[in-house]
């Protein structure tokens, strides 16, 4: 489905009924990335998927923008579908938007789930983004600069056939000049992002997940989130990289649904 935000077409999907769960994509993801997760995540919940500006089936923008427009698109979506509040999940780039949305619209968020994300674009992450941008001259260069480091080394090695299939799909996509131009704008939209001094303003129940081999948003950044967000819990996943949803899909789904659908928050033991 499409709704209009200003002059942009924003694509979204709704699956199932129940307590609403809104999923915010990582930077290279789209609503299609969640195909294998729709069935379990919509069994007891209204699952809401959305492509950010520049992603998937939403409009592309080749002039530079920043996170604030993505935050406003999330709010416009909830107004469009007339949902007063949601459980909000964000992974990586989507987690950054989720944090800013929660700070701006705290009454809209029942629970917050942050996976493999951070409170600021560090010098490290900015240089990673610069490396991605410098590799956009060819599909294979972009693939080799981005994809291997999203996964843990063990997963990458042990799933060579799966990775080669992904490579065959992604390299032609990364050769598309409009795609990589849009990706550069998305990557640069995170420059200057920093909410570290605002994290103590978040009061909603929050689950934070970090992984042992996350080379994009290292675990110390999830630890920082946990240290500064009151009423937050931190889960450390061994033997996984940045793309936990693909490396450990069953565990990932169990964590999300267990946290979202557990109605008991305080235990007096």
Task: Go through each PLM region and give its residues.
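Active-site loop/oxyanion-hole signature of alpha/beta-hydrolase fold enzymes
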Residues: 48-89, 254
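Flexible "cap/lid" loop of the alpha/beta hydrolase fold
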Residues: 99, 103, 110-139
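Gly/Ala-rich beta-loop-alpha elbow adjacent to hydrolase catalytic centers
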Residues: 90, 94, 98
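Conserved HGGG/HGGXW glycine-rich cap/lid loop of the alpha/beta-hydrolase fold
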Residues: 7-60
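Catalytic active-site module of serine/aspartate enzymes centered on a nucleophile-bearing elbow/loop
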Residues: 232-269
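Conserved alpha/beta-hydrolase catalytic His-Asp/Glu region
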Residues: 123-125, 143-198
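Acidic catalytic loop of the alpha/beta-hydrolase fold
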Residues: 212-217
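Short beta-strand/loop motif that positions the catalytic acidic residue
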Residues: 202, 208-210
């Amino acid at each position: 489905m499409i709704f209009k935000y200003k002059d942009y077409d924003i694509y979204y999907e709704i699956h199932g009924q129940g307590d609403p769960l809104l999923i915010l994509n990582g930077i290279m993801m789209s609503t299609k990335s969640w195909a294998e997760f729709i069935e379990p995540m919509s069994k007891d919940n209204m699952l809401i998927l959305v492509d950010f500006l520049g992603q998937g089936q939403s409009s592309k923008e080749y002039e530079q923008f920043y996170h604030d427009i993505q935050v406003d698109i999330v709010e416009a979506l909830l107004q469009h579908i007339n949902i007063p509040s949601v459980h909000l999940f964000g992974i990586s780039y989507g987690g950054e938007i989720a944090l800013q949305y929660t700070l701006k619209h705290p009454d809209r968020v029942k629970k917050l789930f942050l996976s493999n994300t951070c409170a600021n674009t560090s010098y490290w992450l900015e240089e990673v983004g610069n490396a991605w941008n410098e590799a956009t001259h060819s599909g294979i260069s972009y693939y080799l600069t981005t994809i291997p480091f999203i996964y843990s080394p063990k997963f990458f090695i042990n799933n060579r056939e799966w990775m080669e299939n992904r490579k065959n799909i992604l390299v032609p996509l990364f050769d598309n000049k409009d795609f990589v131009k849009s990706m550069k704008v998305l990557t640069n939209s995170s420059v200057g992002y920093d909410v570290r001094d605002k994290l103590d303003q978040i009061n909603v129940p929050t689950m934070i997940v970090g992984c042992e081999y996350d080379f994009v948003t290292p675990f110390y950044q999830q630890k920082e989130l946990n240290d500064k967000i009151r009423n937050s819990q931190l889960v450390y996943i061994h033997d996984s990289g940045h793309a936990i949803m693909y490396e450990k899909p069953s565990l990932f789904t169990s964590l999300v649904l267990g946290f979202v659908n557990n109605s008991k928050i305080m235990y007096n033991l």
